[in-house]
C-alpha cells in the first residue's frame, strides 16, 4: 500500500469534491435531517472546494493513486475533513489530522475546528475539547447542531 499526503492541486478538485459530497451524503443522514444536509451543501460547493485548492488550503491523502481523504486549513483552523466511507475506521482520518496538526502547530499554539455530530467523538479522542455548542437556525423551524472544538499544542 502506497500512502501519500500532499497539497491538493487543481487536477484534484473533482475528486476532492466527490470525497466530501459522497461522504456527507452517506454519513450525515444518520445524524441530521434532510434539510440540514441540504443546508450544508451551500458550504461544500465545487466552486468553494476548487477555490480552497487554488489558494493552497486543501490537502489530500492518496492511497494507491486514489484520493480517499481530504481536509483543509486556514491559519490554525481545520475544516472539511472527510474520509470516504469505505476507508473510515482504518486510521486514514487520523493520518490526515496528524499532518494538518503538524502544519498548524509549527506556527500556532492551538487549532480549532467545527465538528459535525458524527465526528465529535473522533476529535475528542484526539485531544480536542468543546469550547462552544452551536445551534444554528437554518430556517423553517429547523436547526443544525455542531461543536466548536479546540486543541492546544503540547
Features from the language model and the residues they span:
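Conserved N-terminal entry element of GNAT/NAT acetyltransferase domains
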Residues: 1-14, 153-154
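Conserved acetyl-CoA pyrophosphate-binding loop and the N-cap/start of the following alpha-helix
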Residues: 87, 91-99
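Conserved GNAT-fold acetyl-CoA-binding loop/helix
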Residues: 21-47
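C-terminal "cap" of GNAT-fold acetyltransferases
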Residues: 109, 113-121, 126, 133-154
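Conserved acetyl-CoA binding element of GNAT-fold acetyltransferases
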Residues: 74-86
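Hydrophobic pocket/interface hotspot
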Residues: 16, 49
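Conserved beta-hairpin
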Residues: 56-69
Amino acid at each position: 500500500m502506497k500512502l501519500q499526503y500532499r497539497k491538493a492541486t487543481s487536477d484534484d478538485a473533482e475528486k476532492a469534491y466527490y470525497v466530501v459530497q459522497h461522504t456527507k451524503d452517506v454519513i450525515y443522514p444518520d445524524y441530521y435531517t434532510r434539510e440540514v444536509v441540504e443546508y450544508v451543501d451551500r458550504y461544500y460547493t465545487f466552486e468553494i472546494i476548487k477555490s480552497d485548492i487554488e489558494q493552497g488550503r486543501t490537502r489530500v491523502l492518496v492511497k494507491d493513486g486514489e484520493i480517499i481523504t481530504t481536509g483543509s486549513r486556514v491559519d490554525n483552523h481545520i475544516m472539511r475533513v472527510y474520509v470516504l466511507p469505505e476507508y473510515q475506521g482504518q486510521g486514514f482520518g487520523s493520518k490526515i489530522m496528524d499532518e494538518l496538526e503538524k502544519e498548524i502547530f509549527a506556527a500556532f499554539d492551538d487549532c480549532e475546528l467545527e465538528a459535525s455530530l458524527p465526528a465529535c467523538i473522533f476529535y475528542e479522542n484526539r485531544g480536542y475539547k468543546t469550547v462552544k455548542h452551536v445551534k444554528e437556525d437554518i430556517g423553517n423551524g429547523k436547526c443544525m447542531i455542531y461543536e466548536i472544538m479546540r486543541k492546544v499544542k503540547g
